[in-house]
C-alpha cells in the first residue's frame, strides 16, 4: 500500500539450482514463521517482493508456485498490477492449498494499511465481509491444487471447506489434487547417513538399533518389546491432533506403549 520498506535479495547455488532469498530483518528476523500480529503486512510484503524482483534478476518464470495463504497475494497482485506489463506477459501461477482452515482472513483495515488493492477490485478478496487472501488466490491463479485427489474433493464440500466451497465449486475446472510424496532417494533408510543404523527390506536389524538410540536420546525406557509411535506434524486439528488427544491418554494408561510427537502449532495441542 502506501508503506515503503527495505527489500534485499540474496542468492545461493546448490545442487545445480539457484535459490533466492528475500531479506528484511524487520519482517522476518523472528523466532517463528507465523502467528505474529503483523502477519498480513509481512506476507503482503513478501508476495509483492517476489514479483518485483523478477526483472532485477532477469528471470521470466513459466510458472510461479504459491503455497497457502502466506503467498496467496502473488496471483492477486500479478492479475491486478503486473499481467499487463510487457515484461511480465504470460506468467502462469499455481496455488496449492495445504490446509484450507488457514485462509489469511482479516478486517478491511489491512487493505488500506498494507495490502493495497484498489477499492474497485476488492471484490476479488471479499468473503463474508472480510478480506480473504486465499479466496483471492483461488479466483486469480491459473490453476489450484491440493495435496491429494481426495482432499481436492473434500474441500468442495461445505463440511470441510471452511466456507470456501462455493468459490471452489465455481472454479472446479482449475482444481486438482496431486498426492504428496517424499524423495525416495534422500529418505532411503538403506543409504541415509543421518540414521543411527541403516537398514533395508532384506535386513531390518538396523531399525531396532534406530529405535533403541531414539529411546536413549529421549530418556525413554529402552525396550525392544514396547511399540514406539512417532508423529512429526503441525499440531493442529486438521492433522488429526483432536483424535490423538482423545486416544492418547487412554492408550498411555491401558497399553504398554511409547509416543514421540514433534511439531508446533496451536497452543492447546502444544
Question: Where in this protein do the model-derived segments appear?
Answer:
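Catalytic cores of nucleotide-sugar-dependent glycosyltransferases that transfer UDP/GDP/TDP-activated
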Residues: 1-270
